[in-house]
Amino acid sequence: DVDGLLAQVKETHPELDVLVPAEVGAGMMKNAFAGTFDILQTNIAGVYADGSQGLTAYNIYASDEFMDVAKLAYDWNQKGYYIADSTTLTDTRQTFLKAGSCFGYVGPIHPGTKTQESINSGCDVTVIPITDCVTGTSNVAGFQYTIPTGSDAPEKALAVLNMIYTNPAAQNLLHYGIEGSDYVEVRDGVAGYPEGVDGTTVGWTNETWLTGNGSIGLAWETDPDNIWAQYEEFNNNATFSPAYGFTFDSANVKTEITAVQNVLDKYTAMIYSGMADPEEAVAQFNSELEAAGMQNIVDEMQSQLDAWSAE
């Protein structure tokens, strides 16, 4: 009962902001909706990630699921669970956690999130899964290392990439900083803080999932020693989108995507933060999306999905 937990926190600790944004400017509940659709790298249209509707493309913001999240966001905002001015804040979630001024946030998780967030915030963070794990093309294509065609030293750039995927020492440096100053090997294969250092004083922090092949480096002492095996299980047991591997070519609808994005920028953070009655706001939102060319985008995506599935 997440609602009951948040109510208890608000009653017991009125000095805290119960929830803060997971991402600056994205709204409070964006991540509560993130796993419903495979958005096919658009954040505009997509297919149901669980495969329940096959390869049918939808305007994701006209779905019942989006309305449900909008209603929940509005309800929680009315109950005072959200930090004030959540859509215009510039501080990160880690800043609020470090200051001890909030209870938590709704964000994406994976094995090791507890360690990642604890290190970056200096707090002992607890992670509670509230949705199922799904995998779509955006999950694997959204964060890639590339070598620009105009690189002055492509061979050296490739050598760096090769190093961070094959060299354990490079992984540990990127993950945890300088050995002896920022971390020590507390036992075989496991790193921790040196004596006198903690998450608030350490000289280096990083989003550990961004650094290439983390599985060749040290685990962190707050994670299970088999954290990398847990990653493998996590990935293998996720529900895979029926459009996994499909990439949408937006060339034919660039004008519509620009217009639709302007509407998204106007409404999504506001709706995800419960700052407008969803019964009125979502209807107006979708009316403006249609006027901006949403249906053309959906139709183009459907055409490409049909061609892709026929290959």
Where do the PLM segments sit?
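Conserved small-residue motifs centered on glycine
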Residues: 156-269, 273-275
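Histidine-centered catalytic/metal-binding microenvironments
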Residues: 270-311
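Extracytoplasmic/secreted envelope proteins and their assembly/folding machinery
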Residues: 3-6, 70, 74, 94, ...
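Short, glycine-/small- and polar/acidic-enriched structural segments
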Residues: 21-43, 108-111, 126-131
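Short, solvent-exposed loop/beta-turn-alpha elements that line the ligand-binding surface or hinge
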Residues: 39-65, 117, 123, 128-135, ...
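Helix-loop-helix "hinge/cap" segment bordering the ligand-binding cleft or interdomain interface
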Residues: 1-32, 43-88, 149-155, 163, ...
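Glycine-rich, aromatic-lined ligand/substrate-binding cores of catalytic
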Residues: 74-78, 93-192
